Amino acid sequence: MGNQKAIPVTMMACVLHGKEDVRLERIPVPDLQPGDILVRVEAALTCGTDLKVFLRGYHERMIQPPSVFGHEFAGEVVASDNGQFSAGTRIVAANSAPCWDCYFCELNKPNLCNDLLFANGAYAEYVRVPARIVEENCLTIPADLPAAKAALVEPLACAVKGVEDVAIQEGEKVLVIGAGPLGLMLARLSVLAGAEVTTVDDQPDRLAVAAELGVTNTVAERLSAELLERLRDEYTPHKLGFDCVIEAVGKAETWNQAVELVRPGGRVNLFGGCPRGTELRVDTTRLHYDEISIYASFHHTPETVRKALEFIATSQVPAFTLVREGRSLQDLPEVLQEMRAGKAPPKTAILPKLPAGACLSAEELEAFVG
């Protein structure tokens, strides 16, 4: 092995055993394969995907129990079998990497790679980063950037791709449906692109965060036929609809509503993923004669991962507007239940060094050394 710090034999980790069954356990520290690095986790962020994994007990492509889960993290390299990163380097890593050999990689669509390598295991004191991810999607973070900010890179990279896919332009009227963590990131990036952004969500506390991120109009209601008409009438030129609508909920109903709310010649990004087997019924006359362009955005690319880190490091995306508290590794099961009940902030930083029961504010996270 190239270089390393002192590493214990075992570590504390949150292990998924099945549906709604997460246990804090002492397990062996992961062994490294050639080209891997071992990272001491300073911060791992909660994620809607992790909540789904917790509720379902598995993820078809990424995780089968029993297994440590969590995939948004930043930390310090403590052992390296890779010349790019030495022990002591602080890094953020994405949760996947493409092969660059398949048909889609040759088309420069690495997010659609036939052999996309996924990695999990961030809800632990240490996490192994596989060699391919080290080579493609592992970045050094600035010395003054808190880990709880840097860990936002992976989801933000997905949002960067979503906004780039629909090429939002300055002065456009953009509607984001849903103000969950990714909806908020999509809204902020649309603001940075120069758009006038409207966000609709039925939870006022989420919309308060959207306003902090520069969203011009926030509407705290569930979408209905009456609200669709009012949104067009009040927030779009000539009452024709929005230039671009981004759906960030992941339901067939809101996918359809997104199509209804866009203007003729406009673009829709069906960003929110629906459960497998969900079917969509749309008015084909509307699509064809109004020339509606439909997009869907999945995952991230090495390019958008790097752009995401730049947005965070330069504070163009104020990470602690989203990451609003820090909790301990021991408290993760409780945090997941709070997320399930809709009582959690957009993002919670899970901090392995934090004592059980402690809770840090965003201001305290700024100074916390993981």
Task: Describe the residue ranges of each PLM region.
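C-terminal hydrophobic helical "lid"/dimerization subdomain
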Residues: 2-13, 233, 256-260, 302-370
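N-terminal glycine-rich cofactor-binding segment
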Residues: 14-31, 48-79, 106-120
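Glycine-rich beta-strand-centered segment in the early N-terminal region that forms part
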Residues: 30-44, 58-103, 140-144
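Short glycine-centered segments of the SAM/dcSAM-binding site in methyltransferase folds
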Residues: 90, 173, 266-267, 293
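Mid-domain Rossmann-like dinucleotide-binding core that forms the NAD(H)/NADP(H) cofactor-binding site
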Residues: 90, 145-223
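NAD(P)H dinucleotide-binding glycine-rich loop of Rossmann-like/cofactor-binding domains
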Residues: 99-177
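Glycine-rich cofactor phosphate-binding loops and adjacent beta1-alpha1 units
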Residues: 166, 213-292, 356-360, 364-369
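Residues in the short beta-alpha loop(s) of Rossmann-like NAD(P)-binding domains
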Residues: 203, 274, 300
